[in-house]
Design a protein with these regions (language model features):
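Active-/binding-site microenvironments in catalytic and ligand-binding cores
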Residues: 1-258
Length: 258
């Protein structure tokens, strides 16, 4: 059966406005000419002129966080425990079966920035697209932030998934979710306002912290979700295997059978 692949990852670039200033990625590019000098140093007697076109290798040196670019967060990122007291798993311990499964897209692009999605809103959207959640479905949330990646207000855009909305998914067997926003939760300034008004610390990172009850992973900084149908595709999002890490980068892809 013919298949179509849709890239749902964002591009990692030096200085791309994808994170707070202290977290912006930095990439140094070593061109072929510099690579020729390095290659000559590795092989005594070699000169760059002896190499085809005087070129050596091209290499990049990168200074980034595991939370730059499109990445999969492990339960360890949110807390030291999951599943009501078990040790939270790190990214190298995430079951691979979680990372390749049928995908579902929830369209919340209409919701205002800072809105905290409820379980009732998830139910309404699932009813609209005619889908009943199945165990291990990968649920992707398309927000208003997706269209703003690389803009100076990206980290402030989009709705967030609240605790009850997250648990609604997890209680039905979902173990990987994703968003095209900077965070699975609402942007920090909106949460800060709610905390200031209530003094309720449980509102801070409430979607992330749902993993303390039922462990799960989520993808952040996805892209191109508007190109996906609501159902009928498979998501591949295997993370880079970093020992004991809280997250790993992924080239997330949606696979459609046609």
């Amino acid at each position: 059966m013919p298949r179509r692949l849709i890239d749902i990852s964002t591009t990692l670039r030096t200085g791309v406005l994808s994170d707070p200033p202290q977290m912006l990625p930095e990439i140094d590019y070593i061109a072929h000419q510099q690579g020729a000098l390095e290659m000559a140093a590795a092989f005594p007697g070699l000169t760059p002129e002896q190499l085809p076109n005087g070129e050596g290798w091209a290499v990049e040196r990168v200074r980034i966080s595991t939370h730059n670019g499109t990445h999969l967060d492990a339960p360890w990122h949110y807390a030291s425990t999951m599943n009501n007291g078990q040790r939270a798993i790190t990214i190298d311990e995430v079951p691979l079966e979680w990372c390749f499964a049928p995908g579902i897209k929830l369209d919340f692009t209409r919701l205002p920035d800072g809105h905290v999605v409820t379980a009732a809103e998830v139910q309404t959207e699932l009813a609209r697209i005619g889908h009943t959640l199945q165990p291990f479905d990968i649920v992707l949330v398309n927000t208003a932030a997706g269209a703003c990646y690389g803009q100076d207000d990206y980290v402030l855009r989009g709705c967030g998934m609240g605790r009850e909305a997250t648990l609604y998914l997890l209680e039905r067997g979902v173990r990987v979710t994703g968003t095209d926003a900077w965070s699975w939760d609402a942007p920090f300034p909106y949460t800060a306002q709610r905390y200031a008004a209530t003094g309720d610390a449980s509102l801070i990172w409430e979607g992330h912290k749902a993993s303390r009850t039922i462990g799960y992973c989520h993808l952040e900084k996805l892209g191109n979700l508007e190109a996906l149908p609501a159902t009928g595709f498979t998501v591949s999002c295997f993370p880079v295997k970093i020992a004991a890490a809280s997250a790993g980068w992924t080239r997330a892809v949606a696979i459609l059978d046609e």
